[in-house]
Regions:
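A contiguous, surface-oriented mixed alpha/beta subdomain in the mid-to-C-terminal portion of proteins
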Residues: 1-49, 53-56, 77-80, 94-101, ...
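Short, motif-level signal for alpha-helix interfacial/capping segments enriched in acidic residues
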Residues: 82-87
């Protein structure tokens, strides 16, 4: 049976645990940083919770959080396997044997990271996750139901090439620029009038 989950950025959702309890009576939310070398940062990291489609939590996610504070996942696998696999993705290896946090649960990064990959590579990265739903109706699917689950290790198994990293960073810069323009138009509209006229 397919179950739906939300992978939420607790740093971007104020009082996330109180909100989860208020919206869905959720008392157990799985921090991806728990049981890792980053456990002391668990209150700021990603959190996995199960969700019922059409519920108050699902609607709040779609209306308020989906744009930047998390992703919707679906899986047939046991919740413990989904959690284990997602936990294995929290950090990556970069060139020069550098370890870095990986915000794969940011919908902008998820789209850029997975959407253009070959099926075989995407299937491996998604592990037991069958579907990821992103804003704008974007759906990323895993095509091999027998994909193994990765396990967290102190040394990351996932490596991002310099080219992939640059691709993801460029997207973040574009996203920041767009948000800056929107902020200026919203709060300083009168000051900006006439600036685009030669």
């Amino acid at each position: 049976m397919t179950r739906a989950y939300l992978l939420l950025d607790s740093h971007l959702i104020p009082n996330i645990f109180a909100r989860l309890f208020e919206l869905a009576n959720i008392t157990v939310a799985h921090s991806l940083y728990l049981t890792t070398r980053y456990a002391e940062m668990a209150s700021f990291g990603p959190v996995l919770v199960s969700v019922e489609p059409g519920s108050a939590l699902a609607n709040t996610f779609i209306e308020q959080w989906q744009g930047r504070a998390g992703i919707w996942l679906e899986s047939d696998a046991d919740e413990a396997l989904v959690l284990e696999h997602l936990r294995s993705l929290i950090h990556v290896r970069l060139a020069g044997d550098v370890t870095a946090f990986f915000r794969f649960y940011d919908p902008c990064i998820t789209r850029l990271w997975l959407a253009d990959l070959a099926d075989v590579e995407r299937n491996l990265l998604m592990g037991p996750v069958r579907v990821i739903r992103l804003p704008g109706g974007v759906v990323i699917q895993q095509n091999n139901p027998h994909q193994p689950c990765a396990r967290y290790a102190t040394t990351p198994w996932l490596t991002l090439s310099a080219q992939t990293l640059e691709h993801l960073c460029q997207a973040r810069r574009e996203h920041f620029t767009q948000r800056l323009v929107e902020h200026g138009q919203r709060y300083f509209a009168a000051c900006l009038q006439g600036l685009d006229v030669p």
